[in-house]
């Protein structure tokens, strides 16, 4: 694809978009280090820049209804990552525990080149905090990724990690909260994680999110 044919389109956070008209419709690409990536089909894009907290709040607005909206944590984490990329989406009402067979670790296939890292949580709280934080901070300010947790009781969960300055921020888009990392570490047996903001998405990601509908 010859990028010189495309005009610079909208700007969302740090992501530039290129576009051209195909069969009367605008098609968009994300410019990543001068390499154009075609945008995912059938997903709308945000019309304005939103804060991280605003994007998190939009991911799973039906959480209070219970049911599937409390069993879709992977969809919620994915929706947050897509919203930070400029997509106007929310989590699909899919029981992602069933959709992924409830297994950990698992390569979800939402990203090209995803590589799952594992962190066995030490029993010493202070050591656990330092060791995991050091692992995440090495990715650098502004980086973002998926965190999957195997709790000590055998259950699992999915959330988002971000690096903000010299701090690790853990977001739970399923219930719209910023999490105390030390609490997660105390309750967890194993963390599985990988960085997402530097990876390209696959079409499979569209199966677990839907276009945002503020009227729901």
Segments predicted by a language model, with ranges:
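Short loop/turn segments at secondary-structure transitions that flank enzyme active sites
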Residues: 79, 167, 176
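Glycine-rich short-loop/terminal segments
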Residues: 1-18, 22-143, 147-152, 189-216
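Catalytic nucleophile-His microenvironment captured as a short glycine-rich beta-strand/loop
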Residues: 144-171
């Amino acid at each position: 694809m010859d990028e010189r044919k495309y005009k610079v389109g909208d700007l969302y956070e740090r992501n530039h978009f290129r576009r051209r008209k195909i069969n009367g419709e605008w098609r968009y690409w994300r410019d990543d280090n001068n390499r154009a990536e075609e945008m995912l089909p059938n997903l709308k894009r945000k019309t304005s820049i939103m804060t991280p907290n605003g994007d998190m709040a939009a991911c799973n607005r039906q959480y209070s209804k219970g049911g599937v909206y409390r069993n879709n944590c992977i969809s919620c984490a994915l929706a947050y990552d897509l919203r930070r990329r400029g997509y106007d989406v929310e989590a699909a009402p899919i029981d992602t525990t069933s959709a992924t067979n409830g297994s950990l670790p698992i390569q979800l296939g939402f990203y090209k080149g995803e590589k799952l890292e594992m962190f066995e949580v030490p029993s010493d709280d202070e050591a656990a905090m330092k060791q995991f934080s050091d692992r995440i901070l090495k990715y650098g300010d502004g980086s973002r990724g998926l965190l999957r947790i195997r709790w000590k009781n055998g259950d699992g969960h999915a959330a988002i990690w971000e690096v903000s300055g010299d701090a690790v921020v853990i977001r739970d888009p399923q219930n719209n909260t910023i999490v105390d990392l030390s609490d997660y570490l105390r309750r967890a047996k194993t963390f599985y994680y990988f960085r997402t903001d530097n990876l390209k998405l696959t079409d499979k990601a569209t199966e677990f999110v839907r276009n945002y509908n503020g009227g729901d």
